[in-house]
Amino acid sequence: MTRIPKRTLVFGVLCLLFIFALFLRASTAIIVEDLMIDLAAPAAALGLMSSGFFYAYAAAQIPVGMLSDRIGVRFTVFGFGLLGVAGALLFAFSQGIGMATWARILTGAGTAGIWIPALKYLSTEYRPEEFATLTSIINAIGCLGLLFSTYPMAVMVELIGWRYSFAVPAIILLIFTILAWFLMKPRPAQAIKAGEEIADTQTGDQEAAVTASGIAGKQFWKYSYFWPFAIWAFLVYGVLFSFTGLWGASYLQDSFNISREAAGTHLMFVSIGMICGGLFWGILSDRYFKARRPVLFIGTIGMLLTWATLVSFTIYPGPLLTSLLYFAIGIFSVTFLINLGCAKELFPVEIAGTAMGTVNAGMFVGVAVFQGVTGYLLDFFLENQSSLFAFRAIFILYTVCIAVALLMVFFMPESFPGHIKKPASL
């Protein structure tokens, strides 16, 4: 019998942990109606509760990165994993919106300690040429968590209730967190060797970036071409997860009076679109366009047309068209992965990680802001208008924000390795 390498087992467990991290991030969307009733919470309060997850996630990014470097992946994943478990269990048994908000904050901070440490583990345990492929694999597998938070979550809520639908995954997350602790045994010599290989490769790959921009050792935020990528990420990711992470099912249930299961099925197509798009856009950018900006342009145009179409609906468009539009939201919005990579490609290795981490944190701040604003606007419009009118007004806001993101694309320099162009002005 062939023995499975320990690093492969660890990789598998990290993938499973990431599935549960994304599940816990998005699973509140399917239980909005339950939360409003059980917690006696208006839409604005739910928006603030949900945004707490993303503020905490964003705030934890830098500490997680530092801890992964200083105390190692094993301790970081274990500590933050336990925090995420505690948050999920607290949320499952929350008796009011205040307790639920603190629970989501704990869950956000805890699940923030999985993605970055996973990348750190890949960079030290695998060869440099394997890194990009494995990153794509763990991201695609993780998106299964988004898929499970839709129709499967709706079915589970109907069977065991929303509280146990959070408690059960929390227990499973605890099991995998403990398993990761026992599987990840320090191997300093190998880690150092692999880490040196990664550093050498990154230095060679980004030499063009240093030459083109002339910013080695300087603060990235002082350069104007950083901000179009950051603003684009804030707007696109904020709109994406504000809708799919909280309001995507409620829109269908309240506006068109369809069942929770049907709404969950439609929401599932966002996850399917993200899984397909995560692989499609990378191949299109690397092998065919050999450029990043055209992919971002196509993706943003697609988002703009999708949201504009949703604004136009005054009646339920039917299951087929609704599923196609939700799929479009996923496949076009997942170009945020390309945008995030641009921050790494534009800057020298000394500051590329910090630049990428800042863009990543901004993405989650965007979600927190948009979820809060969306909840407030829903309460405002629902005082005198129908749910459909309220959501159409919100979709107009989303469309305008995506239009601003499209404008940002025109200010982005091309960052594809070997084709980096210096912006017109600094």
Label each residue range with its predicted role.
Residues A59-G98:
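Conserved MFS/SLC helix-loop-helix module at the cytosolic interface between two early adjacent transmembrane helices
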Residues M1-R3, P188-A230, S425-L426:
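Juxtamembrane intracellular "pre-TM" segments in multi-pass secondary transporters
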Residues T28-I30, Y223-W281, V367-G375:
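Extracytoplasmic gate region of multi-pass secondary transporters
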Residues A103-L144:
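Cytoplasmic helix-loop-helix junction between adjacent transmembrane helices
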Residues G87, G98-L106, L320-A328:
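Paired small-residue
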Residues R70-F80, D286-I301:
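Cytoplasmic membrane-interface "Motif A"-like loop-to-helix N-cap segments
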